[in-house]
């Protein structure tokens, strides 16, 4: 595909953000000691999709990996809507970013509310002493549209 105009790039970035906001489950990829580790995670985003919010237990490998190496990758996709012969039309959005603990109480309340809005089943988990709210500060989006059409946007 040829180069895109600024307007087309902006429109594509908005499509990527819309997909991230529409979905609520992702695969979080972390690395520790050169070994990759994937976790299925519930998430919510801020309004502009610059931050992706999650919660985890502090006593997990995932959390230790995040502390050791804050660079992460997320996979958000449409495979559930594209089954059988529609599989080639599936979209896969790879989000890269940096892990950051949320420590301000005012922000914790906001993030908690956003997570509960999308995931009411997390209420009990969020109340546990070892539950840690965190965000991924988005650095880029890579959208694979079908099998061959790819779009990358740094943010």
Language-model segments: which ranges?
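Residues in well-ordered beta-strands of folded domains
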Residues: 29, 44, 55, 75-77, ...
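Short acidic (Asp/Glu) patches
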Residues: 56-60, 75-81, 112-122
């Amino acid at each position: 595909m040829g180069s895109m105009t600024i307007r087309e790039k902006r429109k594509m970035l908005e499509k990527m953000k819309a997909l991230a906001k529409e979905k609520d489950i992702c695969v979080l990829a972390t690395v520790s000691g050169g070994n990759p580790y994937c976790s299925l995670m519930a998430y919510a985003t801020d309004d502009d999709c610059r931050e992706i919010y999650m919660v985890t237990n502090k006593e997990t490998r995932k959390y230790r990996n995040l502390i050791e190496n804050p660079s992460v990758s997320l996979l958000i996709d449409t495979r559930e809507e594209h089954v059988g012969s529609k599989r080639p039309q599936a979209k896969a959005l790879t989000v890269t970013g940096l892990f950051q603990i949320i420590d301000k109480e005012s922000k914790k309340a906001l993030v908690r509310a956003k997570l509960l809005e999308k995931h009411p089943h997390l209420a009990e988990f969020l109340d546990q002493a070892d539950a840690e709210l965190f965000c991924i500060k988005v650095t880029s989006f890579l959208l694979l549209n079908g099998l061959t059409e790819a779009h990358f946007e740094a943010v």
